[in-house]
Amino acid sequence: MSKVLVLKSSILGDFSQSGRLIDEWVAARRASGDTVTVRDLAAEPLPVLDGEIASGLRGGESLSPRQQEALALSDALIAELKVHDQLVVAAPMYNFSIPTQLKNWIDLVARAGVTFTYTAEGPQGLIQGKQAMLITTRGGVHKGSGSDHVVPYLKTVLGFIGITDVDTVYAEALSMGPEAAERGIKDARDQLALVG
């Protein structure tokens, strides 16, 4: 049995296609005996990184209450990531990129000296032994093209903190008519059955 951390980031709630796919996947994993923790980053938004929070994430003795709160939240998010075997990220494409809600999580988790460090050979990720899966939904078709700033970015960030074993599931063409959308969802379900 595995411990899985799922990050949902769609702002569309019940209308979210990535949310429906991830909910089906979570139900199947729980039925197989896995422990799944779901963090809905849109329903419970995290603070947006600003100068005060960024400064506070470095720690120190004279932190403001807001900085102390952000540092404690960052520590909790990192601890949550560390205790799970697998990270699953539901990442819809919004205007060629990831949702702000997901970026907020990244900004609180990617911390020098905590989840990565700089060495003479370059940066080294400190989150080791984890596997990740990205489930990305898009209105158009972007896989493997220069317009996909979701998957390459997320793989870079995850690799930077040490998570390099990453599978990707694509649901594309979801705004290109009912038949294309149905095909896109079916393809994603088929991919999930293979990698999930």
Curated annotation (Swiss-Prot):
SUPFAM superfamilies in the record: Flavoproteins (SSF52218)
Record note on cofactor: Binds 1 FMN per subunit.
Cofactor(s) essential for the protein: FMN
Class in the EC hierarchy, top level: oxidoreductase
Reactions catalysed, as given in the entry: 2 a quinone + NADH + H(+) = 2 a 1,4-benzosemiquinone + NAD(+); N,N-dimethyl-1,4-phenylenediamine + anthranilate + 2 NAD(+) = 2-(4-dimethylaminophenyl)diazenylbenzoate + 2 NADH + 2 H(+)
Domain of life of the organism encoding this protein: Bacteria
Enzyme Commission identifier(s): 1.6.5.-, 1.7.1.17
InterPro entries: Flavodoxin_fold, Flavoprotein-like_sf, FMN-dep_NADH:Q_OxRdtase_AzoR1, NADH:quinone_OxRdtase_FMN_depd
GO molecular function: electron transfer activity; FMN binding; oxidoreductase activity, acting on NAD(P)H as acceptor; oxidoreductase activity, acting on NAD(P)H, quinone or similar compound as acceptor
Binding site for FMN: S10, S16, Q17, S18, M93, Y94, N95, F96, T137, R138, G139, G140
Keywords, alphabetical: Flavoprotein, FMN, NAD, Oxidoreductase
Function: Quinone reductase that provides resistance to thiol-specific stress caused by electrophilic quinones. Also exhibits azoreductase activity. Catalyzes the reductive cleavage of the azo bond in aromatic azo compounds to the corresponding amines.
Family: Belongs to the azoreductase type 1 family.
PANTHER family: FMN-DEPENDENT NADH-AZOREDUCTASE 1, FMN-DEPENDENT NADH:QUINONE OXIDOREDUCTASE
Record HAMAP family: Azoreductase_type1
Binding partners and assembly: Homodimer.
Protein name, entry field: FMN-dependent NADH:quinone oxidoreductase
